[in-house]
Amino acid sequence: MSSLGYNILYNLINERQDTWCERIVYPHTNSIESNNPMKNFDIISFSLQFEEDYFNVLKMIKQSGIPLKRKDRSENDPLIIAGGPCATANPMPLSDYIDVFVIGEGEVTINKFLDIYLENKNLDNFLDMDGIYIPEFNNNAKIALINDMKNAYHITQPIITKTDKEDYKTVFSDSIMLNVSRGCTRGCRFCMSSYLYRPLRETTIKELVNIALKTRENTNLNKITLIGAAVGDYYDLEGLTKALESEGFQIATPSLRIDSLSRETLETLKKSGLKSITIAPESISTLRERINKSISDEKIFSVIKNAVDLDFNIKLYFLIGIPYESKEDIEELANYIEKIANMHKNRNYIKFSINPVIPKPQTPLQWEVYNFKEIKSKTRYLKKKLRKYNVKFESPKKGLIQYILSCGNREVGAVIEKSLTEEVTLKEWQSYLPNYNINDELPWSKIDIGIKSNFLKTENRRLKTKKQTPWCGDSPCYNCGPCN
């Protein structure tokens, strides 16, 4: 319910005179607005933000009394669609269960989609649209994106649900979601957001301040959350934070890129009421080179020192299982984290999250494997070494399942369905492990996000050689595809 896209589509659909949109939140199968059962709606749309959502999608369909598989549904059943980053990157694992996938930014397609649906519900009528993949036809689908943030839908009347039910409370329910930018062209090789929604598109400071003022007038909300895959790369982040702070807004952001955090920016954020910052060094310097995240240790430690001086709570994200990572690298990572933890006299103020790298579709890591045995061993070592610090670890098994859901084919749907009624063993999950060569046709090959395959292959080779691809914001165009 906190998803920006989810909120945009809710508003867009309800602005039409011929449609009405309500919300249903797992584990419920009745709507928030009218308590109407899920099976009574004409269209059911799921937002797939994380691969783990797949289990809940199938549970909701089954519990609602709608036939689980699309082949078993009739014209009397709701049309079931899905969108979001996971649907855009690789819709295959759920393709036996979902009728239509929306590829890209739904606000581009939603009105035309509804116009066609209201005129004629036959699925083949949607085939001429960009941003639509229909499993029944296995058609080629081209991503649909807003070309300019001037044409984007900015929310000035957010959904505010007044409820005591914890299930319905959202992460950003008490703040204005300000869509600073979309897309990211930094090219971190493990990150799906770096590739799915290129190119980078930004909203001007003037427009953002106007949106914030109008939303405050409508809602009385005074806290702003800056939303975007590349908030830290905003062309004038310092100018934006100062402009919002001068209007009396409190500013928060889920995460910021380290090299965007000057002392002055941190001071402005602190003055506006921000208490915590989240940053992602990812790993030690040699492994950052592999994943194309070229931030110096000097800059990382400078930002942390400034954050400590300004009395911020700090959360840092690290990765393990980066391709070509050695035992010595993990030992160095443990020492690196210890050094950071000891920068504050109170260790409770600095928290760490260590997660396995999950190879993702549509990225240079899509041909890499998830080595469960190695990740399990590395996790065990780091838990022992860092036990006196505030460190949380993602489960290696959970990472394995996420990898299978991310990069799996249509057959993976069967094991997701099986998990609804019985426990699936680790051995059975492992039987679905992908194993792709760089010249294989991949399960998601029908989905064109605009990135050239040869560009991803080049980036995969550079991963091996630790060769950097500088950010295209500061460098000549690499002809990766989307800007064309």
Each model region followed by its residue ranges:
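N-terminal pre-triad scaffold of radical SAM enzymes
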Residues: I13, I160-M192, R216, K275
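N-terminal [4Fe-4S]-dependent radical SAM core
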Residues: P135-M177, K452-T465
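Short secondary-structure boundary/capping segments
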Residues: I8, I61, D96-I98, Y117-L118, ...
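Conserved SAM/AdoMet-binding glycine-rich loop
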Residues: I43, E52, N210-K315, L319-Y349
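Radical SAM enzyme core and accessory elements
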Residues: K385-N484
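Glycine-rich beta-alpha loop elements in corrinoid/cobalamin-binding modules
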Residues: Y26-N140, P361-N409, E417-E423
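Flexible glycine/acidic-rich beta-alpha junction loops that bind and position SAM and/or redox cofactors
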Residues: Y235, E264-T265, R288-I291, I320-E328, ...
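Local cysteine-cluster metal-coordination motifs and their immediate loop/turn environment
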Residues: N179-Y195, P470-N484
